[in-house]
């Protein structure tokens, strides 16, 4: 019995050392000019059909935006965000060529889903429209969104 206990202590120690570190928060509170704030996701890398590009989700109390270095194509109306296994939420509009906007009910739905979710699958389409390269997706972590949202609500009024 005694030798069995001494064998388990080193085994348990090695097991604890090999445990994965906690995942870091993927969201940052950013103060913007004019006194407002927004939440910025970590940037995700995807292809635009021709080259690698980045996409980032930005959230304010009234809007959810996806920004990219590449030019978006909304001609088919299929730009969307799907949180976990929820139904995908379609974008409302583009703001310029490089920003996809979700506002009103779409933004409210996404913000509620971001608080409860683990990941967001962002589906995008890029210009040029010919030859068409289809949609391209990037998965963004929602770890830390709720904590960042609460911080924004408390400190950015």
Language-model segments: residues:
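Hydrophobic h-region of N-terminal signal peptides that target proteins for export
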Residues: 10-20
């Amino acid at each position: 019995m005694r030798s069995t206990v001494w064998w388990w202590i080193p085994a348990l120690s090695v097991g604890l050392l090999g445990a994965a570190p906690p995942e870091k928060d993927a969201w940052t509170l950013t103060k913007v000019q004019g006194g407002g704030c927004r939440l910025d996701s970590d940037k995700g890398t995807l292809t635009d059909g021709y080259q690698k590009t980045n996409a980032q989700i930005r959230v304010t109390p009234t809007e959810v935006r996806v920004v990219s270095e590449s030019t978006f194509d909304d001609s088919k109306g299929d730009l969307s965000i799907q949180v976990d296994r929820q139904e995908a939420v379609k974008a409302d509009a583009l703001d310029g060529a490089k920003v996809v906007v979700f506002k009103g009910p779409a933004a409210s739905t996404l913000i509620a889903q971001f608080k409860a979710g683990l990941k967001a699958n962002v589906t995008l389409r890029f210009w040029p429209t010919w030859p068409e390269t289809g949609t391209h997706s990037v998965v963004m972590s929602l770890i830390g969104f709720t904590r960042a949202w609460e911080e924004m609500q408390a400190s950015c009024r």
